[in-house]
């Protein structure tokens, strides 16, 4: 890789930035990440990977490694979610009795499961995979400024960077600002934000302690604490003896993070556990703001926003880090398609069209969960929730990269009864291929996928011809010809009948479908791909 020229420059090595880099590198794109810190964050922060994220990480080739590294599920027992006065005190409400409750809600919708890996364990996996495929990272390197241009050398972005050896310019085709809530990239572009704003202020305490005598045997979990002296949360990390306590404070009452001295934090831990005899070893104490904000624009020319730079999500529901991974995947497959000549630049407009609306769903759901579990006075946000499974797996994309055939304004559908309509995830159907049992979802990724009904041989032939003509990878499968559908569910759930076909994007989203044969299938399919790829 040229030290001063790359295809894509990513600013920020959090989940959004590293996901973008990993998915780009896997597609052969020259990508560089710059991170102002000397290394990745050592703190747990966001934890948990939902099934949609695991679907994407399967495509990225790291899902199995994530599951193997999941120490919370692997060694710390079952996972409960409760509202309580304290960990050993009165239980006010049980949200989930077991990890199996969460699995049961989504298992019929996807072949991917859940994982509970914390951010400090996931980020090194993403970075290693990015490096394996040629991606690079420069720690201790700050973005100072950038400018977009279209000159004799072509269109691009020139970034001024400051690294260990001084300042220098780096030229990139595109720049991705994944530099967090206080994004320099976003602020430099003058992009405002909207949303609920600040919800509360919290102090996070990470501590080590043996709580085997405190927790229920064979159980760990997340506790929303409504203690007479404070309100906050308690939860585990990947390390069995490392835990987190988050306590709310009120600046309007003169409270400050500095008030949470080590002695005070030890007292609060004792109250949270209802176990003053515990002697915790404090690892870190940090103040932070819980907020809900979404950037008004996610793209400005050749510059994009991803992760917390694009939206700040309350941590309730564990969706913030997952949304960052989804941002990275969406942006990566579209940038790669444009850079490799498979798509026109108009495809990049669909990043904001799709991910911004998805962010609104995620933020609304996280707000509703926060209100239900921590702030009942915020009942007005409850009705903005569309449901947790619907937010994760039933969302709908609307953009020029989706050729919808209906005018249904609904933003989501029940993922337990998927429609297979354009804009939604391709439904999970168990099939067999070459004697191997798998899901239709396992067929997606690393290019486009066409699923044809039993009488859809012409669509399969068309996919092969159009793929060669346009230089766009399209893998085609036909029910009854190498793809066995024992429940006869593919045609129904994908809405393609016996003679039709469904075209699925690299991210598993249905781009187009028909339930009929075509007089000239190749011409029809080529027209579809040209439209969705802005060719």
Curated annotation (Swiss-Prot):
<dbReference type="GO" id="GO:0016709">
    <property type="term" value="F:oxidoreductase activity, acting on paired donors, with incorporation or reduction of molecular oxygen, NAD(P)H as one donor, and incorporation of one atom of oxygen"/>
</dbReference>
<feature type="binding site">
    <location>
        <position position="308"/>
    </location>
    <ligand>
        <name>FAD</name>
    </ligand>
</feature>
<keyword id="KW-0274">FAD</keyword>
<keyword id="KW-0547">Nucleotide-binding</keyword>
<feature type="binding site">
    <location>
        <position position="35"/>
    </location>
    <ligand>
        <name>FAD</name>
    </ligand>
</feature>
<comment type="subunit">
    <text>Monomer.</text>
</comment>
<dbReference type="GO" id="GO:0071949">
    <property type="term" value="F:FAD binding"/>
</dbReference>
<comment type="pathway">
    <text>Antibiotic biosynthesis; carminomycin biosynthesis.</text>
</comment>
<dbReference type="InterPro" id="IPR036188">
    <property type="entry name" value="FAD/NAD-bd_sf"/>
</dbReference>
<feature type="active site" description="Proton acceptor">
    <location>
        <position position="224"/>
    </location>
</feature>
<dbReference type="InterPro" id="IPR002938">
    <property type="entry name" value="FAD-bd"/>
</dbReference>
<dbReference type="InterPro" id="IPR050641">
    <property type="entry name" value="RIFMO-like"/>
</dbReference>
<dbReference type="Pfam" id="PF21274">
    <property type="entry name" value="Rng_hyd_C"/>
</dbReference>
<keyword id="KW-0045">Antibiotic biosynthesis</keyword>
<keyword id="KW-0285">Flavoprotein</keyword>
<protein>
    <recommendedName>
        <fullName>Aklavinone 12-hydroxylase RdmE</fullName>
        <ecNumber>1.14.13.180</ecNumber>
    </recommendedName>
</protein>
<feature type="binding site">
    <location>
        <position position="317"/>
    </location>
    <ligand>
        <name>aklavinone</name>
    </ligand>
</feature>
<dbReference type="Pfam" id="PF01494">
    <property type="entry name" value="FAD_binding_3"/>
</dbReference>
<comment type="pathway">
    <text>Antibiotic biosynthesis; daunorubicin biosynthesis.</text>
</comment>
<keyword id="KW-0521">NADP</keyword>
<comment type="function">
    <text>Involved in the biosynthesis of the anthracyclines carminomycin, rhodomycin and daunorubicin (daunomycin) which are aromatic polyketide antibiotics that exhibit high cytotoxicity and are widely applied in the chemotherapy of a variety of cancers. It can use both NAD or NADP but it is slowly inactivated in the presence of NADH.</text>
</comment>
<dbReference type="GO" id="GO:1901771">
    <property type="term" value="P:daunorubicin biosynthetic process"/>
</dbReference>
<feature type="binding site">
    <location>
        <position position="15"/>
    </location>
    <ligand>
        <name>FAD</name>
    </ligand>
</feature>
<feature type="binding site">
    <location>
        <position position="16"/>
    </location>
    <ligand>
        <name>FAD</name>
    </ligand>
</feature>
<keyword id="KW-0560">Oxidoreductase</keyword>
<feature type="binding site">
    <location>
        <position position="143"/>
    </location>
    <ligand>
        <name>FAD</name>
    </ligand>
</feature>
<feature type="binding site">
    <location>
        <position position="119"/>
    </location>
    <ligand>
        <name>FAD</name>
    </ligand>
</feature>
<keyword id="KW-0520">NAD</keyword>
<comment type="similarity">
    <text>Belongs to the PheA/TfdB FAD monooxygenase family.</text>
</comment>
């Amino acid at each position: 890789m040229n030290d001063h020229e790359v295809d894509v420059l990513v600013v920020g090595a959090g989940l959004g930035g590293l996901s973008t880099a990993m998915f780009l590198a896997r597609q052969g794109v020259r990508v560089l990440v710059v991170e102002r810190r000397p290394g990745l964050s050592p703190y747990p922060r966001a934890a948990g990977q939902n099934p949609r994220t695991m679907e994407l990480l399967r495509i990225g080739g790291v899902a199995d490694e994530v599951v193997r590294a999941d120490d919370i599920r692997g060694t710390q027992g079952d996972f409960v979610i409760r509202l309580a006065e304290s960990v050993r005190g009165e239980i006010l409400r049980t949200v989930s009795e077991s990890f199996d409750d969460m699995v049961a809600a989504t298992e019929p919708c996807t072949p991917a499961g859940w994982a509970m890996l914390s951010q400090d364990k996931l980020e090194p996996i993403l970075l290693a995979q990015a490096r394996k495929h040629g991606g690079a990272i420069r720690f201790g390197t700050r973005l100072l400024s950038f400018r977009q241009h279209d000159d004799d050398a072509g269109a691009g972005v020139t970034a001024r960077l400051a690294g260990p050896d001084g300042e220098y310019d780096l030229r990139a085709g595109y720049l991705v600002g994944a530099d967090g809530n206080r994004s320099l990239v976003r602020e430099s572009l003058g992009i405002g934000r909207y949303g609920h704003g600040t919800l509360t202020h919290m102090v996070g305490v990470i501590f080590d302690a043996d709580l085997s005598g405190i927790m229920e045997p064979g159980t760990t979990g997340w506790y929303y604490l409504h203690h007479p002296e404070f309100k906050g949360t308690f939860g585990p990390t990947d390390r069995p003896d490392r835990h987190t306590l988050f306590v709310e404070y009120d600046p309007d009452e003169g409270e400050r993070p500095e008030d949470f001295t080590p002695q005070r934090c030890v007292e609060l831990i004792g109250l949270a556990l209802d176990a003053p005899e515990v002697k915790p070893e404090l690892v870190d104490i940090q103040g932070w703001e819980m907020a809900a904000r979404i950037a008004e624009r996610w793209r400005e020319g050749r510059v994009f926003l991803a992760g917390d730079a694009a939206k700040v999500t309350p941590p309730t529901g564990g969706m913030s880090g997952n949304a960052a991974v989804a941002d990275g995947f969406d942006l990566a497959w579209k940038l790669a398609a444009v850079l490799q000549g498979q798509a026109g630049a108009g495809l990049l407009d669909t990043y904001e069209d799709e991910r911004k609306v998805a962010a609104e769903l995620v933020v609304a759901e996280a707000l509703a969960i926060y209100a239900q579990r921590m702030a009942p006075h915020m009942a007005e946000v409850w009705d903005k929730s569309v449901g947790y499974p619907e937010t994760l797996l039933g969302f709908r994309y609307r953009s020029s990269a989706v050729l919808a055939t209906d005018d249904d304004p609904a933003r989501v559908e029940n993922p337990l009864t998927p429609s297979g309509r354009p804009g939604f995830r391709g439904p999970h159907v168990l099939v067999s291929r070459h004697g191997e049992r798998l899901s239709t979802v396992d067929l997606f990724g690393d290019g486009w996928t066409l699923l044809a009904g039993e009488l859809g041989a012409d669509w399969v032939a068309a996919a092969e011809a159009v793929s060669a003509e346009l230089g766009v990878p399209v893998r085609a499968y036909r029910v009854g010809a190498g793809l066995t559908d024992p429940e006869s569910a593919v045609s129904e759930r994908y809405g393609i009948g016996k003679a039709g076909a469904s075209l699925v994007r690299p991210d598993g989203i249905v781009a187009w479908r028909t339930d009929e044969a075509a007089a000239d299938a190749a011409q029809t399919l080529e027209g579809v791909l040209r439209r969705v790829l802005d060719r």
